[in-house]
């Protein structure tokens, strides 16, 4: 079996602590409240040393007329605790509502989205039992910068924003992550054969920074053929770093190749704050049926425990989860 997420080290992790750590929790929408309730119950039983502040965000706040889906007092909690465990939320359909995930990432400066994609063969079916890939996704720029406008009634435009500081932060984070976790290779995905300025800048920065890590192999792939290789032979990759849009799409694909999108958690890391979550959505049609699997959010919480210096609890929780799926208790 692949290494446990509990053993993963985060370059931004705090030192080991025995005092309760303040965190902010949002129970979310759809299946969010039930999987958050299960996750918090597990953390409590495992002895997690946490001081929880709860905030209300998402659909209910949107429908009260707040287009951002989050109120000022919630921002105060996030800036105070600097650690956010978030269940999935629902953004109402229609114009005028902003993506809360994008808003939180940009407001708190969460520049790195880290998604471990690990196979749990033979307990979770996969064609790639040796898969152990970490995708490091730039989290603030690219087409997700939110710079859209209408040129005419029939022409809409979305600008792709790539900056040198943004590239430097995410690429260096990927190499530091690889070094800290005894990984062997960092691979860059981009499309600079077409987008020569934007993706070209990302590629150049990758090549520049890779020279500071001579013990690590550095290579790069055009994203389309790289995606095909990831689907066919994920064992060929170790740590992947890429701009926002590619990372959003391929991290879901990689999680499904490993076994299931529903099992994957992620961390969103900034210089001062961090957010942890499942990578799946709020699944409102499954809400209230007691069938939602909390594993994705639980894995996000495990990454959070490592981040706040409670790797002992993280290992305890993850070992219990492994025993559970070994016993066949999973959806």
Language model segments and positions:
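Flexible, glycine/charged-enriched surface loops at secondary-structure junctions
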Residues: 51-54, 181-190, 213-221, 310-318, ...
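Buried hydrophobic positions in well-ordered alpha/beta secondary-structure cores of metabolic enzymes
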Residues: 29-32, 82, 136, 174, ...
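N-terminal beta-loop-helix "entrance" segment that forms/cooperates
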Residues: 49-72, 228-230
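Glycine-rich phosphate/diphosphate-binding loop of Rossmann-like nucleotide-binding domains
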Residues: 24-45, 152-224, 236
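Short, acidic/small-residue loops that bind anionic groups at enzyme active sites
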Residues: 105-119, 212-221, 263-277, 287
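Glycine-rich phosphate/nucleotide-binding loop
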Residues: 8, 61-63, 72, 122, ...
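N-terminal glycine-rich phosphate/adenylate-binding segment common to multiple enzyme folds
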Residues: 62-160, 245
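Short glycine-rich or small-residue beta-strand-to-loop segments that form or flank ligand, phosphate
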Residues: 22-28, 84-88, 186-192, 299-306
